Structure formats: structure tokens, C-alpha cells
Amino acid sequence: AEGRLVLADGLWYTGMKLNPSYIIDLATLTGACVVALGHEASGLWSNNDELLNNIKKAGEHCGEIAWPMPLFKAFEKEMTDSKIADVRNLGAGRWGGSNTAAAFLKQFVPNGKDSDEQIPWAHLDIAGTAWGAKTNKLVKTGATGIHVRTLHHLITGQ
């Protein structure tokens, strides 16, 4: 679970130093996401419904599936309920691993400048979609470049 620690630093730095309108991270973060969604879809978590829906629609337009996953308060509580740390980087058990990983990351998204609300943020877990074992209409076998098209469409509208 060391990758999520580096990603957490990146989220915090981006939010605090760059004053973004929104933050989107992509990572081959959890095997649990592969168990949940296989190799057909990336998991998508967000603290902002509009951003989540825009990413989902951009992905659909490009043939890249981003499947919304839950960020229940129980997952956040699990990550902040510790006798020795402010925030845990692993859930208490093996269940819901991709959800608790996203809940961990959410803890490091700061509030916007002059705002009491977190910067809109989305996390795409591409563990199951970053590498293709078979050719499809978008890519041959190997590295897929998953969600480059999605993000391009989201940003440019093209």
C-alpha cells in the first residue's frame, strides 16, 4: 500500500500549491478493483457528483468505462478510526479494499482556496484496465493508455 502514500502527497501538494479547479488522479492502486470490475472497467470515486458524471460521460464517449463506486462514510470512518494514527493507509480487513483506498486518498484532498469545501476530486483505479491481455477496438495487447482519451475529451470536449 505504499503507492497510495505517494499519491496522497501528490493530492495534498496539488491542492495546496497549484489552486486547481479540480483534481483527477489515476493509479493502478488495488487488486480489489480488479476483483470487483475485472478488466472491462476502471473504478471511479469522487467527492463531487458533477465531476463524477462528467468523467463517466467522457469515458462512455471514448469507449473507456469508468464505473462509479461508493465512498460511504463508513469507509472514511474506517480509515480515520485508529488508536495510533490520524489516518490509516489500509482498511481493517480485506473487504472493500478499493473503497477504503479511495477513502484514504480523499483524506488528502484539501479545501479550495477561500472555501470550506474540498476541491472537487476524482480517483480512477486502473489496476484492471491499464494492461490489456487481448486486442479490442481501442488497443492491441499490452499497455492501454486507459483514460487518456477520457481526460482529453473531458478537458477539450473533443
Region roles according to the model:
Residues 1-158:
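A generic structural signal for tightly packed, nonpolar segments enriched in small/aliphatic residues
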